[in-house]
Each structure stands twice: as structure tokens, then as C-alpha cells.
Amino acid sequence: MTDKRKDGSGKLLYCSFCGKSQHEVRKLIAGPSVYICDECVDLCNDIIREEIKEVAPHRERSALPTPHEIRIHLDDYVIGQEQAKKVLAVAVYNHYKRLRNGDTSNGVELGKSNILLIGPTGSGKTLLAETLARLLDVPFTMADATTLTEAGYVGEDVENIIQKLLQKCDYDVQKAQRGIVYIDEIDKISRKSDNPSITRDVSGEGVQQALLKLIEGTVAAVPPQGGRKHPQQEFLQVDTSKILFICGGAFAGLDKVIANRVETGSGIGFGATVKAKSDKASEGELLSQVEPEDLIKFGLIPEFIGRLPVVATLNELSEEALIQILKEPKNALTKQYQALFNLEGVDLEFRDEALDAIARKAMARKTGARGLRSIVEAALLDTMYDLPSMEDVEKVVIDESVIDGQSKPLLIYGKPEAQASGE
């Protein structure tokens, strides 16, 4: 039997690299007088991939931004919270400098500086952590502390956090060990009182105990597929001492704990300083004075607090800050919706009074920056529903009355005779 190509010639083709014939492989790719089979292509890909892995750590070593550069990058995406940005910039820089130079410097062992972010909802805690990970080009994952339980109980094991991080970097252990983990709602795992409980608290103090070693640094055995359902599979060994943990929470009521401590320490009698009610510190001012003893009273155990030596407090966003958030960051909400409307070939304009109205509504809801999107979405819903079916619309204008629900957006048409209001 004669082997023939589709073009009718009787020549049998062979891979120029491994020598296999066209019938021994699935695919043979032709070049100028040379051929390569699919098996050799796969082998080349594997070789290149391994070389990239070896080169990547050297590239990362030379790419560590300074605290000033980190702060400038955060300014592009996060409005306000200047002190928190400075604290985060220094802590993150020191953490990755420690990784780059090893755990010791001149015989001195460098400790790990995990971070605790304290601030009201919608103040930018999650956004700060996400922006840092994006700047440093490291794997990033978020975990909700309220879903975690002690091992052996219904809920997520704390090791599942590391498993999620591995998923983000395609189970590359070396890459995962340079990652950032953000644990949200950390205040929700506080114990019910500051006295040790005689009953088992599997979702509060129990989770704090389970997180201790993970945050401080241990070699966690993580199943590649996660969970507790595959006990026989080979486990991945991940050194968590190289992972930066950032914990965040609103800590509602912590300001009262701090106020009680501050007022108690102010003294009584003839030498005491008498303060008028108007002199009472704001929530942000009180949170900036937080001490470990306040967090213990709130319900965090001392050992857990000790693993989070860097504390940054975030202030509640003012109306002016919310207006800035709407229009100034690189991925500002108004810019996102304008880009969305541009895909339909329509310009979207937010007038200044509309931005003021959005900020006022968000302040009234006490949801911070998180509530801005829902307000804008509600105002634009009908327009986004109708716009794809409409013709000749060139521009949509949003003013204060639209945000307040008193009128519909103004639609400006391309043809002057067809110009009309959406009312």
C-alpha cells in the first residue's frame, strides 16, 4: 500500500524533529521544507513554560515598587483614606522586600506583617486590597469569614482559603506563596464576650483559633480539588508564611468601646477635663485611637490580634468624597456607564447636580461607595432597556430630577426635528 498526501504525490511525510511519519501522529504542520508534529509542538510548549517559570521570579525581584509608587497607584483608584494608604504601602513594601531577600537579613529574622483594616462598610477596604494585588501582579483571593468554621463542622475549612488562592494561579504553588489573601467580615467571628467560653464556638472563637497558624505561617496541606471529599488524593504543600493576609471588617460598635476607654482614662474630680457634648470625637477619630485591648473587648482573642500587627483605620466617606469617587478614579462609576453607552453609539452626560443627588442618596442609605452603583443603575434602568431598540439617539443627559425619580433622562436625537424628551 502506498501512502499518499492529499495533493496526490506519493511521498510519505515525516516530522523533522522526532522522525515520526504522518500516520503515527495526529497532525503534521508544514513549513518551508520542514515539518513538525503535534507531539513536538506540545513538548516545545512545555519547555518554554518551564523556562518562563524560572525567569518569572527574577522579573518579580526587580519590579518591587517603592511605598511612594504604591501610594500613587492607590490614589488612581481609591479616593481619600490617606493614612490607610500610607500604612498599607509601607506594610506591603516591607512584606515583599522580606520575600525578595529571604526571611533573614544580616542574621536578623524578619517578622511577618499581616494587616487589619478597620472601617465602615463601603469605605474602600476591599478595593484597597484588590488594587494592591493588581499593582504587584500577584494572585489575589477573597474569603468571607462568616462562612468559615472549625475543621470537622459544616462550613468551609480555613484551608479552603489557600485552595482558592491556588485556583487563581492554576495550582502553581510558588506563585501562590507570593499571593495576597483578603478575609472580609473578620469582625463577625468575634466571640460573644471577652471572657473565655465554656461552650464550643465553632464559627467565632473556633475560627480565630483555626486561622492563627495559617496567618502566622505554616505549611498547609491543601487538596488540589479542595474540600473534604477526596481524602486519598495527594496534597499540595503551601508555605503560608510567604502569603500576605489582609483582614477587614466594619467593627460596628468598636468606637463605643474606644470611647469608654478614653473617657475612663480622662479622670474625675477637680483635676478632670470637662468636655461638652459637642466635643465628642467622631467615629473616625475614635477608630484611629484603637488599641489591642479594645479589640479584645470587642471579641477578638489576644493571639489572633498578635498575628495582625499592622492596623489601618478607614474613615466614613463624606458626601464630597462620594462625588469624587463617582467621577475621578480611572474606573469611576460614571466612566463605566459612559463606556457602556458608547457601545450603543450614545453619549452619556451626568450633570453636576445629578452627582450631588447620587452622593446624598448614598449618604442617607449609609452604604458608602458600595451603594452608588445601585442608585445609578436604578436611574438608568428604563433607558438601558429601551435604548437598543431606539434609533437616532445621540446623547442621554442625567440631571438631579432623574436621580430623585421625578423625571426620565433627557434623550437628544441626531435629527433636530426628532429631538424630544424622554418624559
Curated annotation (Swiss-Prot):
A Pfam family hit: zf-C4_ClpX
Binding site for ATP: 120-127
One term of GO molecular function: zinc ion binding
InterPro entries associated with the record: AAA+_ATPase (IPR003593), ATP-dep_Clp_protease_ClpX (IPR050052), ATPase_AAA_core (IPR003959), Clp_ATPase_C (IPR019489), Clp_protease_ATP-bd_su_ClpX (IPR004487), ClpX_bact (IPR046425), P-loop_NTPase (IPR027417), Znf_CppX_C4 (IPR010603)
GO cellular component term of the entry, any: HslUV protease complex
Binding site for Zn(2+): 15, 18, 37, 40
Alphabetical keyword list: ATP-binding, Chaperone, Metal-binding, Nucleotide-binding, Zinc
Example GO biological process: proteolysis involved in protein catabolic process
Record-annotated ClpX-type ZB domain positions: 2-56
Keyword Zinc listed: yes
Source organism superkingdom: Bacteria
Statement: the UniProt record of this protein carries the keyword Lipoprotein: no
Signal sequence range: none
Quaternary structure annotation from Swiss-Prot or TrEMBL: Component of the ClpX-ClpP complex. Forms a hexameric ring that, in the presence of ATP, binds to fourteen ClpP subunits assembled into a disk-like structure with a central cavity, resembling the structure of eukaryotic proteasomes.
Annotated family: Belongs to the ClpX chaperone family.
Function: ATP-dependent specificity component of the Clp protease. It directs the protease to specific substrates. Can perform chaperone functions in the absence of ClpP.
Protein name: ATP-dependent Clp protease ATP-binding subunit ClpX
Record organism: Salmonella arizonae (strain ATCC BAA-731 / CDC346-86 / RSK2980)
The organism's taxonomic lineage, starting at the top: Bacteria, Pseudomonadati, Pseudomonadota, Gammaproteobacteria, Enterobacterales
Underlying gene: clpX
